[in-house]
Amino acid sequence: MRLKRFLLRYFPPGIILEYEKGGELKTKAIDLLELSPTTDVDLVVGEIQKAEPLITASRTQQVKQLILRLQEKIGQQDSRQFYLFKVLRAHILPLTNVAFNKSGSSFITGSYDRTCKVWDTASGEELHTLEGHRNVVYAIQFNNPYGDKIATGSFDKTCKLWSAETGKCYHTFRGHTAEIVCLVFNPQSTLIATGSMDTTAKLWDIQSGEEALTLSGHAAEIISLSFNTTGDRLITGSFDHTVSVWEIPSGRRIHTLIGHRGEISSAQFNWDCSLIATASMDKSCKLWDSLNGKCVATLTGHDDEVLDVTFDSTGQLVATASADGTARVYSASSRKCLAKLEGHEGEISKICFNAQGNRIVTASSDKTSRLWDPHTGECLQVLKGHTDEIFSCAFNYEGNTIITGSKDNTCRIWR
């Protein structure tokens, strides 16, 4: 084994080792999820050296410099105010979803007008209109981190794969017998998973355009999908009050997470895939041990349905958004509520962390989006201007641009 080079991963903090083994180029990651501005770097370097044979004494200084760079990035204080940069009257009919590519250089909008549009973030110009679906385009996603492909899921029961660069349609995936309402790429960008009102999830092979798997077992529609970081597990959240954990590529159901008393609204893995967070209409969020499928905590406090849940990029914080107009931040390890985000005058349907984990953005039916400090719960800014409820919001990877999507048929870029 011979170490070729180091790659730095800022969020969540880590060092990727590129090495040669038997003539093949391979990579492995050293996760530094606990790294903070006060961490003793020499101690960390020592621990890495003990655990990782590729890091020899001659590399010590290099590794130390990399960790110092990561530390500097984590410690950067960001007091930026966001300003409205562009209002895009994206579609004639209502929007369904908005999503960024990883760098944030472009984003996509889905709509009831049966199209998905690709936009240049810097100029606000439309790059492509992806046409071909025969009904509402509901679920949309880039294959991040690559960002060269887009998947669209439609009420016409099909999923389509497109080139982000040219707008060309590569494949139309047919097989679902009802509307597709969620979809996700696996991290390797070799598979797309789709969830449908027909109670099944399907996996599609990006290369061949063929169906790879059907995951059956839920008793109601599947409305949430999440791959783990390595891509060998997929979770499906359903209106049947349960979440299933599937092994990929075998398609075997490993666990069914039973305990919620209402429909599931969202289900997510944390970064190291040790935990699964589930949000439900039963007003609670639950944390589950992903290895044994046992519930390890029920996060209570909301007075109404929990509509969204998300982890920060390291997996140390869990944030929930509720129909009660508040959001909450919990510690994933202590399971204690760290902050209550209060100020919205309507339900919060979407909540996102920036990659750095020091900001949260929320989307609400009160026509505003708000920016928060997740550690103090302080509202730092109210993004006003939409004239109808906001159902979608997203940060780009750098955290310096936000997009919001509203029922007023506009998409706003804030930077």
Curated annotation (Swiss-Prot):
Disulfide bonds: none annotated. Keywords: Cell projection, Cilium, Cytoplasm, Cytoskeleton, Flagellum, Repeat, WD repeat. SMART domains: WD40. Pfam families: WD40. GO terms for biological process: intraciliary transport; outer dynein arm assembly. Belongs to the WD repeat WDR69 family. This is Dynein assembly factor with WD repeat domains 1. It comes from Xenopus laevis. The gene is daw1.
